[in-house]
Curated annotation (Swiss-Prot):
The gene is leuA. The keyword Transferase applies. Belongs to the alpha-IPM synthase/homocitrate synthase family. The keyword Metal-binding applies. This is Probable 2-isopropylmalate synthase.
C-alpha cells in the first residue's frame, strides 16, 4: 500500500460542478450563503465558479473572493488566456486550469496535438504563477487517458511549478481497484500534491475517492450531497466520514456541521435528498423495525456503525413508528411524550399501529398519540391549544403572498398575519407566529394522492421547538394551503400538550 497522507485537504466544488446539475441555477445571494456555510464547515478550497462563462459568473466569483473567508477561493479556466485572465481578475487564490487528455476528447473537443497540449499547458501554468496566484492543473478524462501520456503531461506542469495536479474521472468509468493503481503510479512518479475528482455515473464516486486517498492522494474534490453533472460527484459527507470514522484520517472539516450544510444546500438548490442518503439523509439514523429499535434503545451501536453517531454529524437519532415497530419502542416513545400506560392499553395501541401499517398508511408521531388518547379516553377538542376559525390568503403575480389567520389560542381570540414566498409559506409562518414560543418547521413534504386538478393533497410536516422536541404530522385536503395549515396546527397542538403533560 502507498503512503497514506495523515491529513487530507477537502476541495469543494458545489458552486461550480454542483451547479452544473440539470435544473440547478443559484443566484448570487444563494452562492454567498453556501460559500459562508462551506467556510464554517472547514473546507480547504471553495471552487466558486467558472469566471469566464458569463458576466454574472465572474461577478459571483469576485464577490465570494472578497468575503475574506478562511478557505482558498478557486476559479475554473480552460488553457485559454482570456479564461485565465478572468479568473485572476476575479481575485481568486487559485486558478484551476483543465485540458482534455484522452484520445476521444482530443479528437473531438480540441484542435491540438498531444505535444501542443503539453506545451500550451506549461505556458498557462507559468503565466498563472507569474501573477502570484496558485495553479491547479487537471488532465480532463484522465481515467481514459494513456497512463504514460498522463505521466508526461503531469511531469511537465510539475516542472513548471504547478501547485497541485488533479486526476479527474470525468465520465465516472473508474473502478476502485483500477483507480487505486493509477493514483499509486502517479504518486510514485510525481512530487507535486495529487487531487482527485470522481463522478458517480456507476455509483462509485465515493469508493473511487476513498481508493485514491489510500493510494496516496493529498486532496479530494467533493460536493455537498453529491450533486453535479449527470449522476453527480463524490459526496462530501460520505467521503469525510469514511476517512474520519473508519480510517482515522484527519481533515479540517468540522463534522458537526455536516447535516446543517446538507439541508442548506438541499433547500437552496431545490434538489431533495432521498431519505436513505448516507450520513445526512433523514433516515440515516432512523429505526422502525422492533428488533433494531429495541437494540438501539439499549445500546446504539447494536444497529448503527458505532464509529459514527448522529451527534458527530449534527444529525438526530429517530425511533420511527410503523407496522414493523415493537411494543418496547412504542412504550418508550409514549413515555417520553408523557403517556404512561398499563400492558393492556399498550397492547391495544400496538395492535392499532399494526393495523394502520398493514393498510399501507404511514404512522406519524401524532397518529400514535391520537391512538393513545383514544385508548385512554383523553381526546378532547377543548384540549387543543390552537383552534383556527378563519383563513384568508392573498396571492398573485403582483401581490406579495399574505396569509391572515383568525384563531383561538389558549382560549383567547387572536388574529395574525404573515407574508412569504408563496401562499403556503405565508400560511405556515402565520401559524407559527400564533404561538409565543420558538417553533420552527424542519421538514415539509407534499404529495397528490388522487389525480386531476382537484387532487387531494397530503402534507407531512415536522415541527421542532427550542428544546429539540419534534413531531411529524399530516394534513389532507383538496386545498394545499389548508392541508398544510392542518398539518402544522396538529403538530403544534401535540407539542404543547406534551409540554403540559411533562410539567
Amino acid at each position: 500500500m502507498s503512503a497514506v497522507m495523515t491529513t487530507i485537504r477537502v476541495f469543494d466544488t458545489t458552486l461550480r460542478d454542483g451547479e452544473q446539475m440539470p435544473g440547478v441555477s443559484l443566484p448570487l445571494e444563494y452562492k454567498i450563503r453556501i460559500a459562508k456555510q462551506l467556510d464554517k464547515l472547514g473546507v480547504d478550497v471553495i471552487e466558486a465558479g467558472f469566471p469566464s462563462a458569463t458576466k454574472g459568473e465572474f461577478e459571483s466569483v469576485k464577490e465570494i473572493s472578497s468575503l475574506s473567508l478562511n478557505a482558498e477561493i478557486c476559479g475554473l479556466a480552460r488553457i485559454v488566456k482570456e479564461d485565465i485572465d478572468a479568473a485572476i481578475n476575479a481575485n481568486v487564490d487559485m486558478v484551476h486550469i483543465f485540458v482534455p487528455t484522452s484520445r476521444i476528447q482530443i479528437e473531438h473537443t480540441v484542435k491540438m496535438s498531444k505535444e501542443e497540449i503539453i506545451e500550451k499547458s506549461v505556458e498557462c501554468v507559468e503565466y498563472i504563477k507569474s501573477h502570484g496566484v496558485k495553479c491547479m492543473f487537471s488532465a480532463m478524462d484522465a481515467t481514459r487517458t494513456e497512463v504514460e501520456y498522463l505521466k508526461q503531461i503531469f511531469k511537465a506542469v510539475e516542472n513548471a511549478k504547478v501547485d497541485i495536479v488533479n486526476v479527474p474521472d470525468t465520465v465516472g468509468v473508474a473502478t476502485p481497484f483500477k483507480f487505486y493503481e493509477l493514483i499509486k503510479q502517479l504518486r510514485e512518479h510525481l512530487k507535486v500534491p495529487i487531487d482527485v475528482h470522481c463522478h458517480n455515473d456507476f455509483g462509485l464516486a465515493v469508493a473511487n475517492t476513498y481508493a485514491a486517498v489510500m493510494a496516496g492522494a493529498n486532496e479530494v474534490q467533493v460536493t455537498v450531497n453529491g450533486i453535479g453533472e449527470r449522476a453527480g460527484n463524490a459526496d462530501l459527507a460520505q467521503v469525510v466520514m469514511i476517512l474520519h470514522a473508519i480510517e482515522g484520517i484527519k481533515t479540517n472539516i468540522k463534522t458537526e456541521h455536516l447535516f446543517e450544510t446538507s439541508k442548506l444546500v438541499e433547500r437552496l438548490t431545490g434538489v431533495k435528498m432521498p431519505p436513505n442518503h448516507p450520513i445526512v439523509g433523514e433516515n440515516a439514523f432512523s429505526h422502525e423495525s422492533g428488533i433494531h429499535a429495541h437494540g438501539v434503545l439499549k445500546e446504539y451501536s447494536t444497529f448503527e456503525p458505532g464509529v459514527v453517531t448522529p451527534e458527530m454529524v449534527g444529525h438526530k437519532r429517530r425511533i420511527v413508528i410503523g407496522k414493523h415497530a415493537g411494543r418496547y419502542q412504542i412504550k418508550k416513545i409514549l413515555e417520553e411524550a408523557g403517556y404512561h400506560l398499563d400492558d393492556e392499553k399498550l397492547n391495544q395501541i400496538f395492535e392499532k399501529v399494526k393495523e394502520m401499517g398493514d393498510k399501507g398508511k404511514r404512522v406519524t408521531d401524532l397518529d400514535l398519540f391520537a391512538i393513545a388518547e383514544v385508548v385512554i379516553g383523553e381526546l378532547k377538542r377543548e384540549e387543543k391549544a390552537i383552534l383556527v376559525d378563519e383563513v384568508t390568503v392573498l396571492t398573485g403575480n403582483k401581490i406579495t403572498p399574505t396569509a391572515v389567520l383568525n384563531a383561538e389560542v389558549f382560549g383567547h381570540r387572536k388574529v395574525t398575519s404573515a407574508i412569504g414566498v408563496g401562499p403556503v409559506d405565508a400560511s405556515l409562518k402565520a401559524v407559527t407566529s400564533l404561538v409565543g414560543e420558538s417553533i420552527r418547521i424542519t421538514e415539509f413534504r407534499m404529495d397528490a394522492i388522487t389525480g386531476g386538478s382537484d387532487a387531494l393533497a397530503e402534507v407531512y410536516v415536522t415541527v421542532e421547538d427550542d428544546e429539540g422536541h419534534s413531531f411529524t404530522s399530516r394534513g389532507a385536503a383538496q386545498d394545499i394551503v389548508m392541508a398544510s395549515i392542518d398539518a402544522v396546527i396538529n403538530a403544534v397542538n401535540y407539542l404543547l400538550r406534551m409540554k403540559r403533560r411533562k410539567s
